[in-house]
């Protein structure tokens, strides 16, 4: 069997700092701040304007999505994504490094990492430890806005990394894919509410396994080692040699499952983009499981 050589999914703060110092930023290397925070908490764009990694552009996940969809954070079209990242100076030959400023060390960056991959881009990495550790280690920051020269990016959707509602519904019968839910246990069980949203009860898709995405991160905000990640999958009886779909509430933290599996040598985890936000509104009641007061989500 021929093993696929995987592009490095993580780069260190030290590597990025040295790359910036040595003048490597440009058409061949771009940095993106993909921070996003719940309304009424922190303001991602304002924080970016105040301080960011030198040369980084702001990737606004609210803009680079399907704004016509009734569901949260759905993927944009190929043309939309290509135009958006092209305007950030990214071409099909660019190595893209993504970070965010979340206190956990990483939250939205893996979503943007996955978005690039699902649109056919191989050379994309997450900054391990995020902006939290960039600051902690004393690396330089700036308020200088980034003005990269626009580039041409041709997006080609890789459908093998994306699952739809219909495919997940069919999978309840065929069981061809394992299904992992990356939300916190209380939300998965239905005993804690979904935050920042009205009309969406908590619970999970029947047959899914709960693997909270925070378990993939160390207390210092770094990705755990491949050995530790494999042990987490094994503990949950998730077989990395078999097909796997990741889900969450809106297709964001599910990408942490895809990243963790990738770091274990499995690059083909698909994300259910609509996730619980869509499933709750569309799926038959018997496919929604909850330990909440109603017994069903």
Swiss-Prot record:
Expressed in numerous tissues. It is found in: Mitochondrion matrix. Residues 144-159 are annotated as: Hinge. One of its GO terms (biological process) is epithelial cell differentiation. It comes from the Eukaryota. It is an enzyme of class 2 (transferase). The modification N6-succinyllysine is found at residues 14, 136, 175, 219, 224, 237. Contains two rhodanese domains with different primary structures but with near identical secondary structure conformations suggesting a common evolutionary origin. Only the C-terminal rhodanese domain contains the catalytic cysteine residue. It catalyses: thiosulfate + hydrogen cyanide = thiocyanate + sulfite + 2 H(+). This is Thiosulfate sulfurtransferase. The keyword Acetylation applies. The active site is at residue 248. Residues 25-143, 173-288 form the Rhodanese domain. The gene is Tst. The lineage of its organism: Eukaryota, Metazoa, Chordata, Craniata, Vertebrata.
């Amino acid at each position: 069997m021929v093993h696929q050589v995987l592009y490095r999914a993580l780069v260190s703060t030290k590597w990025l700092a040295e790359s910036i110092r040595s003048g490597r930023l440009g058409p061949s290397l771009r940095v993106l701040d993909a921070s996003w925070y719940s309304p009424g908490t922190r303001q991602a764009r304002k924080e970016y304007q105040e301080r960011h990694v030198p040369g980084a552009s702001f990737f606004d996940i609210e803009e680079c999505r399907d704004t016509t969809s009734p569901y949260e954070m759905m993927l944009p079209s190929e043309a939309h994504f290509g135009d958006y990242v092209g305007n950030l100076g990214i071409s099909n030959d660019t190595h893209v490094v993504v970070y965010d400023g979340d206190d956990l060390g990483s939250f939205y960056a893996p979503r943007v990492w996955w978005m690039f991959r699902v649109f056919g881009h191989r050379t994309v990495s997450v900054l391990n430890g995020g902006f939290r550790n960039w600051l902690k280690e004393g690396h330089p920051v700036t308020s200088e806005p980034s003005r990269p020269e626009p580039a041409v990016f041709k997006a080609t959707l890789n459908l093998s990394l994306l699952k739809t509602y219909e495919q997940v519904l069919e999978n309840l019968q065929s069981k061809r894919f394992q299904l992992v839910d990356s939300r916190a246990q209380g939300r998965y069980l239905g005993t804690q509410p979904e935050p920042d949203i009205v009309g969406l009860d908590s619970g999970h898709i029947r047959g899914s396994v709960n693997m909270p995405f925070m378990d993939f991160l160390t207390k210092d905000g770094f990705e755990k080692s491949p050995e530790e990640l494999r042990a987490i999958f094994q503990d949950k009886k998730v077989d990395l040699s078999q097909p796997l779909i990741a889900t969450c509430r809106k297709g964001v933290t599910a990408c942490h499952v895809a990243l963790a599996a990738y770091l274990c040598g499995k690059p083909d985890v698909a994300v259910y983009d609509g996730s619980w936000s869509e499933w709750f509104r569309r799926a038959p009641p018997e496919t929604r499981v909850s330990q909440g007061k109603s017994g069903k989500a």
